[in-house]
Regions:
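N-terminal secretory signal peptides that target proteins for export/translocation
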Residues: 1-7
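Structural microenvironment flanking redox-active thiols in thiol-disulfide oxidoreductases
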Residues: 72-112, 123-125
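A short beta-strand-turn-helix
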Residues: 38-57
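Short, acidic, Ser/Thr-enriched surface-loop or helix-capping motifs
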Residues: 29, 42-43, 147-148
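Short loop/turn microsegments at loop-to-beta-strand junctions
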Residues: 35-36, 57, 141-143
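N-proximal helix/coil linker or "cap" segments that precede and/or mark the start of modular domains
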Residues: 6, 14-37
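Short active-site neighborhood of thiol/selenol oxidoreductases, capturing the structured segment around
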Residues: 51-72
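Thiol-/selenol-based redox modules, centered on thioredoxin-like
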Residues: 139-179
Length: 179
């Protein structure tokens, strides 16, 4: 006796398997994991390494592209909350795959008072599970990480809403620093 399985069921099973396997391709950074170190250049040609900031709270926000609507909303929200962020004694870095020159134009246009780091090959974004690739085209995903003074991930935000994100960062920095 031969069992015949309908084609649509086979296709569904194959797609479900591919979908399930896609979650195991790269392990996500979790709270309490050691934050991957990096050394990247900012819009003023200064290099920043995460290890230079041990002992401080660090906010790393990855974003897709300079001077685009969502990214501008996010950057300007952080700019407008700069005094509150400084009051938490945290340092904040924006990171995208754009060039140093692009970051300089973006920073000057919107008077951004924080460093924006250039990750042109996407290696740092990839180490933070924040790289989106489509063939040879790459962009950073809109993800954010709060790193504690010991260099460990204290909070992750995946696929953030640019308009509401700054307040979430501030609230969580205050909460995490009380623990």
């Amino acid at each position: 006796m031969q069992i015949i399985i309908p084609t649509n069921i086979i296709k569904t099973l194959i797609m479900a398997s591919i979908f399930a396997l896609s979650f195991n391709i790269q392990a996500e950074l979790q709270v309490d994991n050691k934050a991957p170190n990096f050394s990247l250049q900012d819009q003023e040609l200064n290099y920043h390494s995460l290890s230079d900031y041990l002992g401080r709270w660090v906010v790393l926000y990855f974003y897709p592209k300079d001077d685009t609507p969502g990214c501008t909303t996010q950057a300007c929200g952080i700019r407008d909350a700069q005094k509150q962020i400084i009051s938490t004694k945290a340092v904040i870095f924006g990171i995208s795959l754009d060039s140093v020159e692009s970051h300089k134009r973006f920073s000057e246009k919107y008077q951004l008072p924080f460093s924006i780091l250039s990750d042109p090959d996407g290696k740092v974004a990839d180490s933070y599970d924040s790289l989106r690739s489509l063939f040879s085209f790459k962009l950073a995903k809109r993800n954010t990480f709060i790193v504690d003074p010991n260099g460990r991930i204290a909070k992750t935000y995946i696929g953030v809403n640019p308009a509401k994100h700054t307040q979430m960062i501030l609230d969580d920095l205050i909460y995490l620093q009380k623990e």
